[in-house]
């Protein structure tokens, strides 16, 4: 009886530890944050190509959605540490209807915005996508033409 109980407890412990590891293990060089994993990719892409790259990377991946100052600060530090090129970084915020109604590509909702001063300004009536602006240390947002080429930040559910 004692051997059976010991074996059962060992199997239960192994199952629980494997299950926990599977639910929230980010790959190496990804940043774990609030149940998601984030990675900055240095290869410049348009906003749409960056979004499609994230989606193809793994089911449940999109361009990153930012919902709090604390998360933005951690992600800005991560980008500064890992980005291999200079430049602003696409995030998942865009205006697909071109009516100044900003939505996240993962369809999440938020009242949080971190626009740089004077933004969004829709310069030349063609800025419908959003990047983390490099001159602000990746803390503030700027609207930009979606066809511009920038590195990008993916978020994935693991």
Curated annotation (Swiss-Prot):
It comes from Bungarus multicinctus. Residues 1-23 form the signal peptide. Glycans are attached at residue 121. This is C-type lectin BML-2. One of its GO terms (cellular component) is extracellular region. Coiled coil: none annotated. SMART domains: CLECT (SM00034). InterPro entries: C-type_lectin-like, C-type_lectin-like/link_sf, C-type_lectin/snaclec_domain, C-type_lectin_CS, CTDL_fold.
């Amino acid at each position: 009886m004692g051997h059976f109980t010991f074996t059962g407890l060992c199997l239960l412990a192994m199952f629980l530890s494997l299950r926990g590891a599977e639910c929230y293990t980010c790959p190496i060089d990804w940043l774990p944050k609030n149940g998601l994993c984030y990675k900055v990719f240095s290869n410049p892409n348009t906003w749409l190509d960056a979004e499609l790259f994230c989606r193809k990377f793994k089911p449940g991946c999109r361009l990153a959605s930012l919902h709090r100052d604390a998360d933005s600060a951690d992600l800005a530090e991560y980008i500064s540490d890992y980005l291999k090129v200079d430049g602003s970084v696409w995030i998942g915020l865009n205006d697909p209807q071109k009516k100044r109604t900003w939505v996240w590509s993962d369809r999440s909702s938020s009242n949080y915005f971190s626009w740089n001063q004077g933004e969004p300004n829709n310069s030349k009536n063609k800025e419908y996508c959003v990047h983390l602006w490099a001159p602000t240390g990746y803390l503030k947002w700027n609207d930009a033409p979606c066809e511009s080429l920038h590195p990008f930040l993916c978020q994935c559910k693991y």
